[in-house]
Design a protein with these regions (language model features):
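Charged, low-complexity surface segments at secondary-structure and domain boundaries
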Residues: 2-3, 42-44
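Conserved PLP-enzyme active-site core in the AAT-like
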Residues: 2-13, 18-21, 25-26, 61-68, ...
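A structural motif shared across PLP-dependent enzymes of the aminotransferase-like
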Residues: 13-37, 45-54
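Ligand-binding pocket scaffold of soluble enzyme catalytic domains
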Residues: 49, 57-59, 122
Length: 194
């Protein structure tokens, strides 16, 4: 059986990414702040601790994003909030033909979203499904890591096509962050979740 793993970054790219993270940390935190407990509790007006705001800026800087938001529940929580923020209950969402990750399926069901499936491995089929359902689809969820062993799609090409169609694109970047050269938002997606 042939597999198609994601292309991992090189050792040199990994080092450069680590330096980028350290640069972002030193731009957003002053000296001793890095070694402190941080600020415990919610700050009036920010509605979160100041330290959280700084960490969010570190993430945004690291991934060249306009903003970042830390949420509870790791990737699952991030996907839940992204779907809730970007789509309305009952909207149609484009997904890959493989099984949807179980915790993501719970959110899709809870929101009453209507999955429309396309084989992301076949760009022509993806284009056909987008054309056929152009008046229905409001957004798309693209998982960067492989869902099925035979998956081979180029998530960058999938995202580019979906953005051409004016769709809101949310990516599930779990298990891909810091391992691939670009996460979803760096490849043009509206929201990266991890």
């Amino acid at each position: 059986m042939k597999t198609y793993p994601l292309h991992s970054i090189s050792l040199e790219q990994a080092k450069q990414l680590q330096f980028k993270v350290i640069d972002a940390v030193t731009r957003n935190f002053q000296g001793e702040e890095v070694l402190s407990l941080g600020d415990l509790g919610v700050v009036k007006g920010l509605n979160k601790p100041r330290c959280t705001v700084k960490v969010e800026k570190v993430f945004a800087d690291t991934f060249d994003a306009p903003a970042a938001l830390l949420v509870r529940g790791s990737g699952t929580g991030a996907i839940r909030w992204a779907l809730t923020a970007c789509l309305k209950p009952g909207d149609a969402i484009l997904v890959h033909t493989s099984p949807i990750y179980t915790t993501t399926q719970v959110t899709i069901d809870a929101m009453g979203l209507k999955p429309i499936r396309a084989d992301f491995n076949d760009l022509e089929q993806l284009k056909a499904v987008c054309a056929q359902h152009k008046d229905e689809i409001r957004g798309a969820l693209v998982q960067l890591t492989r869902q099925k062993i035979e998956d081979r799609y180029d998530y960058r090409a999938v995202i580019a096509h979906l953005k051409e169609k004016g769709l809101t694109v949310i990516t599930d970047d779990n298990y891909a962050v810091m391992k691939v050269d670009r996460i979803g938002c760096e490849a043009g997606a509206d929201v990266s979740c991890f």
